[in-house]
Amino acid sequence: MGNKLGRKRQIVDERYTKPQQGLYMSKDVDIKKLKKLILESKLAPCYPGLEETPSSHHDLEECPICFLYYPSLNRSRCCMKSICTECFLRMKSPNSAQPTQCPFCKTSNYAVEYRGGKTKEEKSFEQIEEQRVIEAKIRMRQKEVEDDEERMQKRLESYSSSSSTSAATLDTEYGSAAEDDEEIVSSQESCLPSHHPQVTRDGQFDFDLEDIMVMEAIWLSMQEPGIQRNTSPDDISEKDRNEEPSTPSSSSPSGGLACAIAVLAERQQMVGVSSSNQNVNLASQNLVPDNGNNSHYNAIEQDSNHYLQGAGISYTRSDMTDDSGGETSREVTWQ
């Protein structure tokens, strides 16, 4: 009666009641209080830690903070993780005003208890728990890798679809721009004036021969008065006696004809074929004198025929009029 079942108190050597390893240089530790807690089996003794597990001691435990092996360790009340006494004193400072969190599960009011060495059941249970934790970490890692691959695949698909859409849009825009450029070029070409004279089916320039002959006659009539003024009648008679009769020179008429053709071609280049033909017709009509001056015009025409015959051109004017009084045809022959 009155007997109480309990764990037998472990006898601890006094030298293990204070830090032996010297891992942390802390002056805030109360050595007397620490000794009392160790002797009351509330904290694990401060055994010296080993860096490697000897082959003769397979029951040593590793501290997850300092990675040293000890005969026994403290256990956190929140997550049952092992920790040595020196690491616990470093984590839970007695002069700290804020509550200490568990270094493993981040639970506030971190506290530990000492249960002695682990039994076989506890060790096997810990191994199972560790295996579960490892498997969970592996699954989480695989899930992260799969998520990354899926995200990358979606990104590639979206990029390919957007690139194809942009390429189609660029092709459409390029085609429309090319069509617009072609339309602009064609409109500009149509707006530009033609710098080439109009050519007939026979490969000849479409000039009005009557206008050319009239211009040639005018040019010749302008040249004759100057020659007559500079030459006296005696000189002319003496020159006629000395010179033999010869065919009239065609250099002067041909030169005048070339000048007339050049002038008319230049006018056609500047104002266009249609407008130039109209202007030449108007000029030819203006050059024709009225009925009061027919005698003077006939004299000029006879002179022009004389010089054109010397150049090898036979010009015959045969005008035919229709009922309305308009001119219908003209004849020009070449010898």
Curated annotation (Swiss-Prot):
Region annotation (Disordered) ranges: 143-203, 224-256, 310-335
Pathway in which this enzyme or protein is active: Protein modification; protein ubiquitination
Can you name one GO molecular function term for this protein? Answer: zinc ion binding
Q: Name the InterPro entries on file.
A: Sip5/DA2 (IPR039301), Znf_RING (IPR001841)
> Which GO annotations describe the biological process of this protein?
protein ubiquitination; regulation of organ growth; regulation of seed growth
Q: Which UniProt key words apply to this protein? A: Developmental protein, Metal-binding, Transferase, Ubl conjugation pathway, Zinc, Zinc-finger
Principal EC category: transferase
Reaction catalyzed: S-ubiquitinyl-[E2 ubiquitin-conjugating enzyme]-L-cysteine + [acceptor protein]-L-lysine = [E2 ubiquitin-conjugating enzyme]-L-cysteine + N(6)-ubiquitinyl-[acceptor protein]-L-lysine
* PROSITE patterns named among the record's database cross-references: ZF_RING_2
Q: Does the keyword Nuclease apply?
A: no
As recorded in UniProt, its EC number(s) are: 2.3.2.27
**Residue ranges, compositional bias (Low complexity):** 158-169, 245-254
List the RING-type ZnF regions, as residue ranges: 63-106
- Outline what the protein does: E3 ubiquitin-protein ligase involved in the regulation of organ and seed size. Probably functions to restrict cell proliferation during organ and seed development.
Miscellaneous comment text of the record = Plants overexpressing DA2L exhibit reduced organ size, biomass, and seed size and weight.
Q: What is this protein called?
A: E3 ubiquitin-protein ligase DA2L
What lineage, starting at the top, does this entry show? Eukaryota, Viridiplantae, Streptophyta, Embryophyta, Tracheophyta
